[in-house]
Amino acid sequence: MKDFAIIKRDGSKDRFSLDKIMNAIIKAFESVNEDVDLASVSKIVSHIDVFDGVTVENIQNQVEQALMREGYYNVAKSFIIYRQLHSEDRETLEKLKFLTDYCHAANAATGSKYDANANVEHKNIATLIGELPKSSFIRLNRRLLTDRIKKMYGKELANEYLDKLNHHFIYKNDETSLANYCASITMYPWLIGGTTSIGGNSTAPTNLKSFCGGFVNMVFMVSSMLSGACATPEFLMYLNYFIGKEYGLDYWEHADKVVDLSAKQRTIDKMITDCFEQIVYSINQPTGARNYQAVFWNVAYYDKPYFESLFGEFVFPDGSKPDWNGLSWLQKRFMKWFNKERTKAVLTFPVETMALLTKDGDVIDKEWGDFTAEMYSEGHSFFTYMSDNADSLSSCCRLRNEIQDNGFSYTLGAGGVSTGSKSVLTINLNRCIQYAVKNGLDYADYLSEVIDLCHKVQLAYNENLKELQAQGMLPLFDAGYINMGRQYLTIGVNGLVEAAEFLGLKINDNPDYLHFVQKVLGLVEKYNKQYRTKDVLFNCEMIPAENVGVKHAKWDREDGYFVPRDCYNSYFYIVEDDSLNVVDKFKMHGAPYIEHLTGGSALHMNLDEHLSKAQYRQLLRIAAKEGCNYFTFNIPNTICNKCGHIDKRYLKKCPNCGSEDVDYMTRIIGYLKRVSNFSAARQKEASRRFYANGTNEIKE
C-alpha cells in the first residue's frame, strides 16, 4: 500500500500507517487471549480498502467486517467494545472541554456551541445544564428523522439529506429540541377549562386576578412544549373581558375612579397597570423549562376593521361578544404603559405587532394609523403588519385564508390564532448557487433538487410529529391550543443577497436583482404549492438567522466559497450599505420582492434618531403604497452601565450622569436585547449596521 492521507475525527489529515492497523488487530486478539500469526493478520488486512481521504471511522468499520468475515467473532466483538469505550471517553472529554470554554466565554450567547441566543442573558449552572445535552439531542433528532425518511423515500434520500446537512447546503433549525417550533395559540381552551388539558391543575379563570396569574402560568406551560415563540393574539381581548366583568363595560370612560378600599386607594387605571406589571415582568423572567431564558412571547394589536374581520363572530363562554371600545382603549393604554416602562427596565417581551388594514395606499382606520405613528414618534419599538384585503384573513394576523393562493404566516409566531410553524428547514442559497455555477450546472435546476429534498424531509418530520401526537405527547394539539392542520412546515432561505453578489448583481432596486429574487423565491413557492395538501401547509421565510447567518458565512468561507461578510443578511438589501435611503429599503421589501415569501421577511428600518409623528405617518403611507407588509423601526436605546439610566435616543454618553460607559438595546433580529448580550459575532455585525438619518430624508 502506498502513502495515503487519512482524515482523523477532528477533521485533520495524517499519513496512513499500516502498522497502526496491524497493531490494533493484534491487540484485539490479545484482549480475548487468542493466538494470531502474521499470515492471519495479513489476510484480515487484505479485506480493507484504503484510499486517499479515507476516514478513521471507515477503516475501523472495515476492520470489524474483515474480522467477522474471517470468523473471528469474539475478536470482532472485543474490537467493537473497545471502539465504543473510546468513543464514550472522547465524548466525555469533549463535554469537559465545552464546559471549560463555556465558563470562560464572554457571555452565554458566545459560549453556546450550537445555537447562540441573546435571549439568554447570563451564564450560570442552569444555562450550562441546558447546553450540555444539546449534541445528544442533535444526534437523536437526526436519527429519528433519517429513519422516517428511509421508511417513506428510501435510504438513498436519507443519505442525501445527511450529506446536504453535513456539507452546509441546508440547515435544520432547532435540532437541539424535540419540540415543534413556534405557535400562535388560541386561549379559548384555557378560558373554559384552565390548564388541566395540558397537564396543569388550575381551573378556568373567574376574575381579573385569577386571569393575570393563570395567564402567566399558562404561557410558561405552553412555551415549555415549544422550541420557539409563543404568541397570544387574544391576550388583550380576554384581559378587556375580565376588566369589564370587574368594573363594568364602560370602565375606560372613568378610569380615574377610585375602586380600591385599601390604604393605597387605587384607581381603575392603576389596577389595570398593576395587571400589566404583574404579567410583563413575570414573563420576562428566565424560565427553568427553557434553559433559563425568558419565554419568547408575542402579542398583537388591531385597528377596528382588522379586529372586526378576525373576531366579529367571536363569543365568550357567557354568550357576550368582545367590546371594541374597551379593547381599543386598553390596547392604547398598554402600549403607552409598556413604552414608558422600557425606560425603567430592559423588557424584551412581549414582541408587539400592530395589525392594520389598508386601501388605496393608506390605512383604512385613520385613528389607528395616527396612533401607530404617534407611538413610533414617542420612541416605542414594535412591528407593524399591513394587509389590503380583509376577506383574505382568517383568525390570524399573519395567516391569509387558504381560499387565497398564497398563505402567509410569520414563524416568530406573532399574531395568529391556533397557527404557527411546526418545523423550519433552511436552504443556504449562497452555497447552493455557487456550487451549481462552479460545477457547470444550471443553478435553478440544482436549487429545484435541493428544494424538493427539503419538502420530502419536512413531510417526514410531519409524520414523526403526528406519531408523537398519537402517543399523547403533544397535549397542546389535543387540547386545541394549536391546530395541526393550520401549522406550517417552513422552508427557510438564507444567503440570498450574498448569492446575488456572487452573480455580479447590484443589490439595489433594479430589474436584474428583482428578477433574481423572484426566480429563486418563486422556485420555493412552486414546490410549496406542489406539496401542499388539505392536511399539510408549506410556507417560505427569509429566516432571521440570529445564529445560522454567522455559521453559514464561517462554513462557506472555510470551504472556499465567495463570502462578502461575516454574517449573512436577513434582508433584501445589504445591512451595512449607506447608499440606500429609507424609501429605497421600503421598496426593496415591497410587494414585488416579498411576493413569494409567504412566511415573512421583516424590514428592520435602522434609523439614527426618532422621526416626528407626521414623518412616521408618511412612512405608513409609503409602506402601504409599496406593499411592504411587515416592518419595524430600529433606533438603539442607550443604557448607562454606571447609573442604570435608559434613554430612548441613540447617544454616546448618559444624559443623566454624563458617563460614556454605555450599552445599547437594539433588535438582534426580531427582539430587543442589550448588545452586550449578543454573541461576539453578532456584536461585530451590529457594529457594521448602517443607521440612516430619516429626519432629513422623509418629508412630513
Can you annotate each of these PLM segments?
Residues 1-108, 483, 685-691:
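Charged, amphipathic alpha-helical regulatory modules used
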Residues 4, 46-50, 312-313, 498-505, ...:
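Short, hydrophobic beta-strand segments
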Residues 17, 21, 231, 489-496, ...:
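Catalytic-loop motifs flanking and including active-site residues across diverse enzymes
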Residues 96-485, 506, 510-664:
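Conserved catalytic cores of very large enzyme subunits
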Residues 237, 489-502, 522, 667:
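Contiguous, well-ordered alpha-helical segments that form the cores/surfaces of helical PPI scaffolds
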Residues 270-273, 502, 687-690:
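Metallocofactor- and cofactor-centric catalytic cores in central/energy metabolism, strongly enriched
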Residues 656-700:
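Long, charge-rich boundary regions
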